Structures are given as structure tokens and as C-alpha cells.
């Protein structure tokens, strides 16, 4: 009687989330250890407590010990396999998880959320070891169910469509999830749809999808990632100002995050590519980006902007940018390279006097990687 009372009081404690009390009562029941039925039940509930408290190895052992002792007619027998499947998933023992969940779904007779959750976890165990055909079969079962578990299964099927190189099927399934607007995986599907378009280089579709997503759900856990991907889509469409606005929103959302640091790099790259270095410095000053306000950073970014114009072949504009750099940074770290590019601009523009003067400045600056090439051109001119 005392053993039975201890077990039932432990179950009551578990129902009340008093896990420490439950653990103590189950130890008491185990120490009594007289009745085989309650010895087995003690193991089952010890497994439940251990799993809840994060001791997954002990939970696995207790579930297995219970299964060896318990009659198959007991409901706990079925749920021991269910719990064992979860324990094996947590321990990354996917074959053992498959075995446990397969037993549960084969022998459990109720058509309820536990059954379809177990199917989903079985699908996950196959998915984790890249057995996608088996995973698809399992998820398809759940996708036809009426319980909420169908939403996860449908989302996983979309991912498998992508893995199986069926982009149209993946996109159609994701769009269906988004348009139905049911369940807990609408955000996941919406964001994944945008990413899928971008991975296929369908930047217009990706930008449209992600813009609608970020406009609709500021609180989504995918909000910041979606903004970063949206910036990438806009950048590839040549809409650099729109891309910069997205990056700025990432910085504003959480300035100290790794995402913000990546966004700052994107903002810097856009300003430099547009030759708007002073605008970037103004932004960096407003945001307190001290590392980008140093003399070295200003030198580097100002030169990078001028170099981009040169590499794009606009020699007239490059002359102006390079001269501005040389005037602003008399002892600049990139002075030699700037003089070389400037002299080449003048040669292309057939401004020979300016070219000779610039080459002379470069040669007088001392030995460099450009000395031999410049000396050859200088002597021939």
C-alpha cells in the first residue's frame, strides 16, 4: 500500500509540476520495491522526471528498463516508447529513435495528436540521417490528418521537395501554407519561400515575398534574417538604396548583434560603391561606429570609393575622386596605388602633362610595385 501511495502521490506532484517532490516520492517507492507492477511504474515515472530535468541518459535507461518489465496492455508501455523516442532524438541516436517511434505508431490505437506527433518525430529521425524517401512517406501520413501536426508535416514536405530538386513543388507547397494562413509554420513557410526565390536568383519574386513578410510581422523570429535577405535581393536588382534601408533597419533593431555588424558592412559597401563615402561617415558618426571613424578607416574607405570608380571605367570621375583622396590624405596608406590609377586615367584621357606630373610624383615617392611599369611609360612619353 505504501508503495502504491508513493507512486500516485508522485504522479500528482508531476501533474502539479513539482518535479523535485515527484523525484523524492519515486525514490521512496523504489526503496520499498515490493510489488512488481509498481516497481515498473516507478521506472516509467522516473524516466519522465529525468527527461524533464534534462538527464536524458537516465531517462533513456529508465524507459528501457520499464519496457522490459511492463505488460504491453498498459498505456504507459506505449508512452514509454514515445518518451524513449524523444530521448534518443535528444541523444542524436537516430536509429534507436526510429525504432522507438515505429513501435509507438504501430501499436498505439488512438488517432490523436500523440500519434501524429510521433509520426512527425519519426519523420525527423529519417530526415536527420538523410533518408528523405522514408521521411516523405511518414510526413505524408500526417499531412492528411486533421490535427495541428499536419502543419509541421506539410512544411517538412516542402523542405524535402527542395532537397529532391523539385523547386516548383516546393514553391507551390510553401505558397499554399502561406495563403491558408493556418498553424504555427506560416512564418517559417513565408520566409523560406522568399529565400527559395533568392536561391533560384528570382530576385524580383524574392524581394516581393520578403517585403510583404517584413511589412506584416515585425515580431517574427525571422524578421531580422528576412531584412538581411531582402537587402541582398534588392542589391542584386540594382536597388542599392532600398538594400541600404533594409540593412539600416537591421542595425536599428539590435545594434549590438552579429546581424547588425554584417548589416553595417553591407551599408558601408553600398555607400562606397556609390562613391558616397562622406555620407557613410555621417551615418557611422550618428550610430557611434567608432572603428569606422578612425583615420585609417577614413583613408581606406575614401580610397576604395575612388578605386571603384576607376575600375568601372569612368576615368573623368575617377580623376576627381582620386585627386580628392590624394588632397585629403597627403600621407595616405594608399597613396602609391592612387597615384598609379590617377596617372593611368590621365593617359587614357590623353592629358599627357598631367600624366607625366603624376608619374613623376609616384616615382619620387620611392620604390613600389608600380615603379617598373610607370618608368617604362614615363620614358616613352
Language-model-derived ranges and their functions:
Residues 1-381:
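Acidic, polar-rich low-complexity tracts and alpha-helical solenoid repeat scaffolds
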